[in-house]
Structure formats: structure tokens, C-alpha cells
Design a protein with these regions (language model features):
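Redox cofactor-anchoring modules in respiratory/redox and cofactor-processing assemblies
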Residues: 1-186
Length: 186
């Protein structure tokens, strides 16, 4: 709805001239993390994470290095810096294994703890589950507990295999979209 008046004034051709072959137009994104400028910003769908982080948001704060991009909010996933040239359109994001979700992303520097970021996402999804299906109701709690163990120094190498197994099981057996995406951050 944010673009309707501009499209009516300038025409559909004007709007379709923005974006790329995968998606036309623009999208409003919520930006956060260790970038100099956070907030809501509108971008052409062909814009990349790198362009947003460096050219629009002023780069990573305190001249640190980009460690990870968390795309798609709490049901989204993590991307390494090597994927920063990915365009912010639906298909390009799916190609690298993340969803657009709420059209948000956070860019974090090397001081961020990926385990803590994953715990936050899993904890949020655990609180939001309806509890109808066992994979979400029990599986998300088990995953959160394993992540707690790892972050508090009680983790074992076999916990990684258990986490992977739990994530795969939840992804395949959950009854709704929340369950299917609740473990993407892990």
C-alpha cells in the first residue's frame, strides 16, 4: 500500500523499471544490528545486502568486520559475509536458504555470538508456538536447552548432531509454517 499513490501518479511502468528479473518494484525493510544507521528503509528489489550495509547504513559500526547477516527475522536464517552480494528479492533469498519473512535483516560484527542469536530466535518461536504439534511443543524446547548447554560451556560435540537431527525432524513434521521455519536460525 505504501507505493500505490506513487504508482498511480507515475504509472506501472515506472514501478516495474525498478527491481530485477526476479521481482519488480521496491520493498520496505527493517534494518538493525551493528550498523551505523538502523530503521525502516525502502529499496529496489535488486539491491544487495552489501549495498544496504555499506552504502545506505554507513557500514558496520566501530569499523569492525561483518560476521553474519540474520535475514527474515526470527523465522529467517543466517548468512555468512560471502553471501552479502545477494539481492533482496524473494527468489535470490531462497537460493541462499533464507526467507524474506518480515522483510528485515540485521548485520552483526565479530562481537556477536551466533549461539545467542539462534537462542533468541528459537526462544521466540518456542513462545509463539500454538503447542498443537509435538515437534514444536517439545522439539523447540529441546533445541533451546541444547543451545543453552553449548553457550554455558556444557555442550558436547555430539550435541551438534542432535541439533541437526531435531531441526530436520521439526522441519519435516511440523503442522504449520511456523514449525517449518522456526529452526532456520539453528
Amino acid at each position: 500500500w505504501a507505493t500505490v499513490s506513487a504508482i498511480l501518479k507515475k504509472g506501472s511502468g515506472w514501478y516495474a523499471s525498478m527491481g530485477n528479473d526476479n521481482a519488480k518494484g521496491t520493498k520496505v525493510w527493517a534494518l538493525s544490528g551493528n550498523i551505523k544507521y538502523n530503521g525502516l528503509m525502502e529499496f529496489d528489489m535488486s539491491t544487495t545486502f552489501h549495498q544496504v550495509i555499506e552504502d545506505v547504513c554507513g557500514g558496520i559500526s566501530k569499523k569492525k568486520e561483518l560476521k553474519i547477516i540474520h535475514a527474515g527475522g526470527v523465522t529467517g536464517g543466517f548468512l555468512p559475509p560471502s553471501k552479502a552480494n545477494t539481492a533482496l528479492d524473494y527468489e535470490s533469498l531462497l537460493d541462499v536458504g533464507v526467507l524474506m519473512g518480515q522483510a528485515s535483516f540485521a548485520a552483526y560484527d565479530e562481537s556477536a555470538c551466533v549461539i545467542d542469536l539462534a537462542k533468541f530466535s528459537v526462544g521466540f518461536n518456542e513462545a509463539e508456538t500454538c503447542g498443537k504439534c509435538t515437534p514444536c511443543r517439545i522439539g523447540l524446547t529441546l533445541i533451546k536447552n541444547k543451545l543453552d548447554d553449548i553457550s554455558e560451556g556444557r555442550g558436547k560435540i555430539e550435541d551438534l548432531d542432535k541439533l541437526q537431527s531435531l531441526c530436520e525432524e521439526i522441519n519435516v513434521t511440523a503442522l504449520c509454517g511456523l514449525g517449518e521455519t522456526a529452526v532456520k536460525a539453528v
